Amino acid sequence: MEDGRPVWAPHPTEGFQMGNIVDIGPDSLTIEPLGQKGKTFLALINQVFPAEEDSKKDVEDNCSLMYLNEATLLHNIKVRYSKDRIYTYVANILIAVNPYFDIPKIYSSDSIKSYQGKSLGTMPPHVFAIADKAFRDMKVLKMSQSIIVSGESGAGKTENTKFVLRYLTESYGSGQDIDDRIVEANPLLEAFGNAKTVRNNNSSRFGKFVEIHFNEKSSVVGGFVSHYLLEKSRICVQGKEERNYHIFYRLCAGASEDIRERLHLSSPDNFRYLNRGCTRYFANKETDKQILQNRKTPEHLKAGSLKDPLLDDHGDFVRMCTAMKKIGLDDEEKLDLFRVVAGVLHLGNIDFEEAGSTSGGCNLKNKSTQSLEYCAELLGLDQDDLRVSLTTRVMLTTAGGTKGTVIKVPLKVEQANNARDALAKTVYSHLFDHVVNRVNQCFPFETSSYFIGVLDIAGFEYFEHNSFEQFCINYCNEKLQQFFNERILKEEQELYQKEGLGVNEVHYVDNQDCIDLIEAKLMGILDILDEENRLPQPSDQHFTSAVHQKHKDHFRLSIPRKSKLAVHRNIRDDEGFIVRHFAGAVCYETTQFVEKNNDALHMSLESLICESRDKFIRELFESSTNNNKDTKQKAGKLSFISVGNKFKTQLNLLLDKLRSTGASFIRCIKPNLKMTSHDFEGAQILSQLQCSGMVSVLDLMQGGFPSRASFHELYNMYKKYMPDKLARLDPRLFCKALFKALGLNEVDYKFGLTKVFFRPGKFAEFDQIMKSDPDHLAQLVKRVNHWLICSRWKKVQWCSLSVIKLKNKIKYRAEACIKMQKTIRMWLCKRRHKPRIDGLVKVGTLKKRLDKFNEVVSALKDGKAEMNKQVKDLEISIDALMAKIKSTMMTREQIQKEYDALVKSSEVLLSALQKKKQQEEEAERLRRIQEEMEKERKRREEDEQRRRKEEEERRMKLEMEAKRKQEEEERKKREDDEKRIQAEVEAQLARQREEESQQQAVLEQERRDRELALRIARSEAELIIDEAQADPAALRSLDFHPVTSKINGTRRTMTPEQMAKEMSEILSRGPAVQATKAAAGTKKHDLSKWKYAELRDTINTSCDIELLAACREEFHRRLKVYHAWKSKNKKRNTETEQRAPKSVTDYDFAPFLNNSPQQNPAAQLPARQQEIEMNRQQRFFRIPFIRPADQYKDPQNKKKGWWYAHFDGPWIARQMELHPDKPPILLVAGKDDMEMCELNLEETGLTRKRGAEILPRQFEEIWERCGGIQYLQSAIESRQARPTYATAMLQNLLK
């Protein structure tokens, strides 16, 4: 198969593996892995892709691959990753794979300089190239830019963000302190906002949008950081293998002894907010020794330090302090920050116990007194007030008047713990807000022309246990994925369609329904949660039940019992829900959803913290106090500040800002779950590529144009440098002249209605045109002027030549017309008088024989006068007949009758002469005359036979035409019948297409859900439950249908194998193939498990007509699917393989497809029944064709060929292609199945093409002339030809 070329087939861990196709199944291909002779496996046909010829080759831009598909995309990234080339392009989108080690010199200052001002594609792929492109776009297009850095946690988003900021400040900074401050702000933000998780040692637990602002000279003037959704729950509790925010550990490890004493710090295991997670420090061998032993926890001493090339708690503390100094924080402010951090740690160590009184309240434990004292000291609070506020809550009664009575309500232990944690989270959250504000204050700007924003926000998260933080993060990623879809897929395709570029449409999964599920008004999960928070006694269970009740039929929402992970099946329906995100299904446990959605403290704690003696603490809460003046607490109820809706508002503002800018994308990829270097886990990387939309982008970029410019923008850019004669040019014509002057290849760009577009990888040419340097623009204008002069002179030359050619052509045509008229007149006259002319010729021949009669008579001695008289009489009769023929209209029969009488008379006279001729010489002459007469008689008989044969052929052609007209009338009658039910059929098909589209979305989501569950299972060591194993009987009971996606009104669930099988049905080539499948009906023979070779052998040997018909039908069906696969996965920039002319393979079969078997069962016979009825009917066809490469050429330059076909019943037996400039191509069934037309006779529409059918003799003459007999004989001798009518006839002839 495929001449032994390798293909990519799916592999469970590597993503894809290379192999060869050895057999074609009903919906799958049999693959033999390379290097594993004899070992085969089945792969669904839509999951198999052709491989590059050189498997070790890598390209910088995936759009440069010969085959553009997800397998070659993955392999190219893998090959480059193995060579430590972690960056790859897909057009102008950068794919960055996290190497998990430092690659030498890749981010050096020399590397930064090498990318400055360079077009995308002229240097190896790099994050610096994207940053420089954003800067140049901002400068040329006069438009702010955004760089969206996305990817899963641990994929390298934060590091790439830092490299972008460093590049912009070092390359285009103003040379002042502000450049360093922008870069130095990162360590400070990471210290307070990043933490170790199970999937990332330096995970950003907040989102940030960093804006670098530029003045009119395109120099950096300042920056601004916006932050989103700090994960506050991490402050109080972490997972076993996770840590709190870095600042806590860095303070414990790196603070001086003086600071430690002032802040009362010790090792992390002594603090509740740290000791429930990992308490080990990040350190290398040297810095581990610098950390004092009393600062290390037992866990650290036992297991050693954590290792990461980018993290070092002791060294990072020093770097953080240096960064604080550079951005303008003095020692006092720095100590204030540390003091609040330490105060939060001590606050977490306060414990409570039951009071033991009837009031039902609680008291502080004795061992917590010290922690209470430290906390009050560090936060500037009164110790007694803090104790009271943590154990009681103040309520106001309004019954007695406007002021009411103050009542202190004691809190239970659990309520006190919650109040303590709420205070800790609030304090730290305000501290983080303050850090971000101080960072923004350190690089202020007065005026800004444009900015470049870099978005770094937490990637899609999926853990064994997911809470409100993961819900908000994944909601954010849903919105960002939608923005990516809109900007790259939707808007691009709409622009291509609007500009008339004719780019094929690329389908992608729209996640709007998932976003609506979360954020829709009243019905969205966030609004349901807010409504729950406003209830007098809110509960997580009531909230969860409300979500399920309001969205019980929503595709994107499900109950935990339907999770693919066993651990989630134990969660009750009112304790969680599953959301099917774009990247896969995530199960959320709703415990604490209500609590985490409220950002407000109860009045006692808020009053306490706002009235702190410490000025710094009061400043932290001043802004929030001012914001909340309008929402005062009433009657002792907790005020409510919605975290979810606050985040939604921030996110919408962010997206509005992104939509107003030009966008560049960096897709970060996590190569493995173990976070180790040089470990490439293909399957999970493929999943990331699919979820990030890279596969859809690859499909779009096959015919896409990522760079574009408006005609008017280009024209206006050059206008002031143009002379007057050029300024009069139309903008479109000027652009065309500009591209011609630059010598650009027409394949690399395309003109739309208002813009010019460039192919992927042609960014250097685009930048050359868009370069706004005055000298460069003036030089280009000169080249345009020179090109216009040359082109116009050439046009004058061509016009002159064309006029001369036209004159000669007119003269030639006039002469040809005269010749045609003469010829036609002659032919008409000849056809009219043909019998008389033939009669005159025959009579004239008879007259010539009179000379010989006279010679014989003159030689006679006796009876000469009498014989002369008889000869004269005969001559007179001949002359009279000739005159009669010339003067009157006689029929062929009349002429023949009189001619025969004359012949008889001449024969009588001849016999008389023979009696009188005694001499041998005279007898010899008479004998010769007799021979001549005999020859004449034979010639007349041959003429008569030829005439009858011609009449017979004319009769057969008339019968064929009559048969074609009859078939045409029958077809029209069927079409008339179909039109009566067309509206109903079209409605049904529209519903089927809609259901199929919805089903494909469901199937794609099912696949992503399963892949995500597998990844969670691998990372959490859980087992995944396969539905097929869980309930096989239930699956067997389902009636799967290739089109309908609902069974008895309910949506069905499918396994990935069934999903892929159905998706492969879509590959079948167009409506003709689907119509054949639909017409097949119920089958007597189940051939689904037969191999391709078995089908072929049965066709060659079977005598069972029904089995033979079934095998042929299945054989050709598989050929259709296989050829559809080849067509879809053909090489780029290659001509489409033609097994038959386009008019045959693209025949409009829609009328037959629209006929559903249930609605019009008599419209068409099943294929097998057709074959039985047409079993020995032989039909021959001939149609012209034009090669695809010539179809857009001038009509005079097109090279037309002829395509011949011999159909044995419904299937093709022999095929010929006659080309004008190369030898004929001969094909026979069996030997050349892969190259022949695979459609049956009805599907080709040949029987409905006027003049297409020819006589067997016409086919056989061409076949024999081209060497067809020898070719067929060699195929028979080598046992490659399939038994057909042609093989049987040839074998009989040879015998």
UniProtKB/Swiss-Prot annotation:
Phosphothreonine sites (modified residues): 405
InterPro entries: Kinesin_motor_dom_sf, MYO6_lever, Myosin-VI_CBD, Myosin_head_motor_dom-like, Myosin_N, Myosin_S1_N, MYSc_Myo6, P-loop_NTPase
In-chain residues carrying the UniProt-annotated modification Phosphoserine: 267, 604, 1156
Interaction with OPTN: annotated span: 1117-1119
Tissue: Expressed in the retina (at protein level).
GO MF annotation: an example: microfilament motor activity
Organism: Bos taurus
Amino-acid positions noted as binding ATP in the UniProt annotation, renumbered to this chain: 151-158
Annotated segments matching region Interaction with TAX1BP1 and CALCOCO2/NDP52: 1061-1286
Protein name as annotated: Unconventional myosin-VI
Region (SAH): 917-984
Residues covered by the IQ domain: 813-842
Major subcellular location class: Golgi
Described function: Myosins are actin-based motor molecules with ATPase activity. Unconventional myosins serve in intracellular movements. Myosin 6 is a reverse-direction motor protein that moves towards the minus-end of actin filaments. Has slow rate of actin-activated ADP release due to weak ATP binding. Functions in a variety of intracellular processes such as vesicular membrane trafficking and cell migration. Required for the structural integrity of the Golgi apparatus via the p53-dependent pro-survival pathway.
Keyword terms, alphabetized: Actin-binding, ATP-binding, Calmodulin-binding, Cell membrane, Cell projection, Coated pit, Cytoplasm, Cytoplasmic vesicle, Endocytosis, Golgi apparatus, Hearing, Membrane, Motor protein, Myosin, Nucleotide-binding, Nucleus, Phosphoprotein, Protein transport, Transport
PTM characteristics: Phosphorylation in the motor domain, induced by EGF, results in translocation of MYO6 from the cell surface to membrane ruffles and affects F-actin dynamics. Phosphorylated in vitro by p21-activated kinase (PAK).
Domain notes: Divided into three regions: a N-terminal motor (head) domain, followed by a neck domain consisting of a calmodulin-binding linker domain and a single IQ motif, and a C-terminal tail region with a three-helix bundle region, a SAH domain and a unique globular domain required for interaction with other proteins such as cargo-binding. The SAH (single alpha-helix) region is characterized by a high content of charged residues which are predicted to stabilize the alpha-helical structure by ionic bonds. Its contribution to the mechanism conferring the myosin movement on actin filaments is debated.
Gene Ontology, cellular component aspect: actin cytoskeleton; clathrin-coated endocytic vesicle; clathrin-coated pit; cytoplasm; cytosol; endocytic vesicle; filamentous actin; filopodium
Extent of the signal sequence: none
Gene: MYO6
Stretches the record annotates as Disordered: 934-955
